[in-house]
Design a protein with these regions (language model features):
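A domain-level signal for the structural core that forms small-molecule/cofactor-binding pockets
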Residues: 1-192
């Protein structure tokens, strides 16, 4: 369900490092999906790498390492369906991605490592995710990866979207605005 994009300096993932990091980050993605190591979960666990030339990556107005902490510049964007993660879950992702990169490219025993590993979690608004040319909801993604809708995690998801439906209704949003789970019916938006 999440997509992870890794931007890294040219030449910093030599040899088997990229493949090793891809595997570690795939493990992070599966952890994010609640351990969904199912065919559906694996199909949604996408890691993309973009190598950036040194002359195209500026920090503090410079392209060298003057303002860069070891193990170097890394920017990771993690796209997740809106409403899937609370603040604690996102903090777990920040820590796990940083650890994977420092473990493979730096010195994990040095507490100063990883300050230049930037991890940004982006919530993709419900209704903006698609596959096979169709819009898919977070509920459909949960079904695909085998995430139970009876557990605490999905209870939080339902509470999040129920509150959002009430907010939309109170603000007078049109019922077909989008951004709500299919189970949050148009009637719920109108009645709020």
């Amino acid at each position: 369900m999440p997509v992870l994009q890794v931007y890294y300096p040219q030449g910093s993932l030599q040899g088997g490092r990229k493949a090793a990091l891809a595997q570690r980050l795939t493990d992070v993605l599966l952890m994010m999906e609640g351990g969904a190591k199912t065919p559906g979960g694996m199909a949604f666990a996408a890691v993309l790498f973009t190598e950036v030339p040194a002359t195209d990556w500026w920090v503090g107005g410079r392209t060298d390492a003057t303002y860069v902490a070891p193990p170097g510049k890394f920017l990771i964007r993690v796209d997740i369906p809106e409403g899937y993660m609370n603040r604690s879950h996102k903090s777990d992702v920040h820590a796990a991605v940083n650890k994977a990169i420092v473990d493979l490219t730096g010195d994990p025993s040095d507490p100063k490592q990883g300050a230049s590993v930037l991890v940004i979690v982006n919530d993709v608004t419900e209704g903006n995710w698609g596959a096979r040319g169709r819009t898919i909801s977070l509920a459909a993604i949960a079904d695909s990866v085998g995430l139970a809708k009876t557990g605490e995690r999905f209870k939080w998801v339902r509470n999040y979207f129920a509150a959002k439906a009430r907010q939309f209704g109170a603000a007078g949003y049109p019922p077909d605005t989008g951004g709500l789970l299919p189970s949050e019916s148009e009637a719920e938006v109108r009645s709020a």
